A protein has these predicted regions:
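Conserved N-proximal alpha/beta basic substrate-recognition cap immediately N-terminal to
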Residues: 1-29, 46
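ATP-grasp fold ATP-binding core
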Residues: 8, 31-54, 69-86, 171, ...
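Glycine-rich phosphate-binding loop of ATP-grasp-fold ATP-dependent ligases
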Residues: 14-18, 38-65, 90-91, 113-133
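Phosphate-interacting basic helix/loop segments used at nucleotide- and nucleic-acid interfaces
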Residues: 17-26, 31-34, 152-164
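Phosphate-binding site of ATP-dependent enzymes
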Residues: 63-119, 174-188, 196
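A long amphipathic alpha-helix within ATP-dependent nucleotide-binding catalytic cores
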Residues: 75-77, 82, 103, 114-183, ...
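C-terminal catalytic subdomain
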Residues: 185-217
Length: 275
């Protein structure tokens, strides 16, 4: 993540990798001069929103004079960036083969208020079921930035080529509202050069009944129903119901589950798992 910020800062926005408490405070004060009052602090290597804190400027100042562990420094330090009032998280799934990059689809990401990943929603039409103002903003201002020939996509391809990377790649992004309430867009908050949960959701959705959507989520194993939920098929493909994707043992804490429905509102309820 630290290297991504350095290489793709034009698209990822203001953020900085820090390797000491004083460095962190300096970065926060610099962001505060730009009008930011809250910040997100995160580890360079973390998954599903782990290792993330939301802090005020007063809380960041408490790091003055403090050091960081050798492990954190070896990872690239702690990353600090402005905290946004996010209203829609999503990911863009690409495939890089040779010198070609191709967009495969967009996935809505479900993120808890604390930044914890809860699940991915994949529907044939990405903007279906969204508020009209958000859908219009997406179609007119946002989605064109991820087209195969867009500047961001070309920058992403160059970034991957410089690192000799080929294969699946997911970009996390989001919409937020600024202090005036206007919609804003962060083109990229993280680049994941691997098979992501969003990519898995996209591939699964292509195997269910036409016109239907999929929710891929992580749930507590203890909350799973004692009996499998009934499923309905349409022309041999899953059209409704849910399926657990991994084997559940007495020692299982979490499970990966898919839910299928034709209407997005049928899939928008989530439990927040805890340790």
């Amino acid at each position: 993540k630290a290297l991504q910020i350095q290489a793709l800062q034009r698209w990822m926005g203001p953020g900085r990798s820090t390797t000491s408490g004083d460095d962190l405070v300096e970065a926060a004060l610099s962001l505060a001069k730009q009008g930011w009052t809250e910040f997100v602090l995160k580890r360079p290597f973390s998954t599903a929103g782990g290792g993330m804190k939301r802090l005020t400027i007063e809380e960041v100042l408490q790091y003055r004079g403090k050091g960081m562990s050798e492990k954190i420094i070896s990872e690239g330090g702690l990353i600090i960036e402005p905290a946004h009032d996010r209203i829609l998280d999503f990911s863009i799934q690409y495939l890089i083969e040779g010198k070609e990059i191709r967009q495969l689809g967009l996935i809505e990401q479900i993120i808890s208020p604390s930044g914890q990943y809860l699940g991915s929603l994949s529907f044939p039409k990405f903007c279906s079921g969204m508020n009209p103002d958000i859908a219009q903003f997406l179609m007119e201002k946002v989605l064109p930035q991820y087209a195969n020939n867009a500047r961001f996509t070309e920058s992403l391809r160059n970034w991957a080529e410089e690192r000799n990377f080929e294969g699946p790649l997911g970009v996390d992004a989001y919409l937020y509202r600024d202090s005036s309430g206007s919609l804003q867009h962060r083109t990229a908050c993280e680049v994941n050069p691997r098979f992501t949960m969003g990519r898995v959701a996209l591939d699964i959705r292509r195997q269910v009944a036409p016109g239907h959507g999929v929710c891929l989520e992580i749930v507590k194993a203890a909350k799973l129903p004692q009996r499998d939920e009934s499923v309905q098929l349409l022309d041999g493909r899953l059209a409704s119901g849910s399926l657990v994707l991994n084997e559940i043992t007495p020692h299982s804490h979490f499970a990966a589950r898919i839910r299928v429905a034709k209407q997005k509102r049928s899939l928008e309820s989530f439990d927040i798992p805890t340790k």
